[in-house]
Amino acid sequence: MLSPRRTKFRKQQRGRMEGLAHRGSTLNFGDFALQAQEPAWITSRQIEASRRAMTRYIRRGGQIWIRIFPDKPVTMRPAETRMGSGKGNPEFWVAVVKPGRILFEIAGVSEEVAREAMRLAAYKLPIKTKFIVRPQVQEQE
């Protein structure tokens, strides 16, 4: 599972997910992509489950790029703990995703295979997503 090797600070504030994604919203590496339609925190486990579903489906052919990285620690307090006495310990890592962000890219496979692989990956994610095709690829077919 993905997580940072080291961070400057152990804990972060939650923040807000307002507006659209400007960075990471264009297709850069592959020919097909999965784009987020809603804001969400995507955990490293969800990213890994999606990656496994895609790689299992496309087998040897093609290449996958993961365009998001879980760099935000989410803290939790132990169950049945009284209020106060500080913030909890980091439990897992999330990637903050805004609408329009490209999540995964695929190249080296046909559109049908890519579409099905992305559909399997999208099932593992807690948000609505959209399948995107690079414009040059559409013209060739």
Swiss-Prot record:
InterPro entries: Ribosomal_uL16, Ribosomal_uL16_bact-type, Ribosomal_uL16_CS, Ribosomal_uL16_dom, Ribosomal_uL16_sf. GO terms for cellular component: cytosolic large ribosomal subunit. Keywords: Ribonucleoprotein, Ribosomal protein, RNA-binding, rRNA-binding, tRNA-binding. Pfam families: Ribosomal_L16. GO terms for molecular function: rRNA binding; structural constituent of ribosome; tRNA binding. One of its GO terms (biological process) is translation. Binds 23S rRNA and is also seen to make contacts with the A and possibly P site tRNAs. Belongs to the universal ribosomal protein uL16 family. Part of the 50S ribosomal subunit. This is Large ribosomal subunit protein uL16. The gene is rplP.
